Amino acid sequence: MRSLFAATLALLALASAARAQTKQQLVDDWERQRTNVLAYVDAMPDSAMAFRPTPGVRDFAQQIVHFVATNLEVAAISLRGLKEAPFTLDTTQLHQKAALRDYTDRVYGYLLEALKGATPSQLLKQSSLYNLPAQSATRWLNLSYEHAVWTLGQTVPYLRLNGVTPPGYKQPL
């Protein structure tokens, strides 16, 4: 019976390791996301940065900043152990395409630098953000990535309603 239990534990450990994303895969995913997000910002006309498809929803620039700022907070708090994001976008420049693009690129640069420099113990370190239960840095990064993909997808109609074909998605494989 003990042998069966030990074998089951070993199989579970192997299955978990097989599912685990490597640090390089995380870096590759975040670099690809950076490319995709910057392509969306580049595609949207300057005149449409404040465009919103209906009243009461975020405009295009606000949508981008919403998830990009979250990515920055996750990197700063979960990877670097800071209390808050190390920089923000000047809100007076929110709807200036060049400023939005620069902020977005800077955030992804910060996140990627923090991720590339993270040790295995930093990736496993538990932290709590947004009054939610503590999670590992890797889990926070995955949740932030998912949030960014979801929110970027919401901007497709913003582009189309301004006569812009959304940029093609860069496949990971």
Labelled PLM ranges:
Residues 14-20:
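Sec/Tat signal peptide C-region and signal peptidase I cleavage site
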Residues 93-128, 136-150:
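Acidic/histidine-rich alpha-helical segments that form the ligand environment
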Residues 1-8, 17:
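Bacterial N-terminal signal peptides that target proteins for export
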Residues 20-27:
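Short, low-complexity N-terminal intrinsically disordered segments enriched in polar/charged residues
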Residues 27-31, 35-38, 48-89, 128-173:
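Short, contiguous alpha-helical
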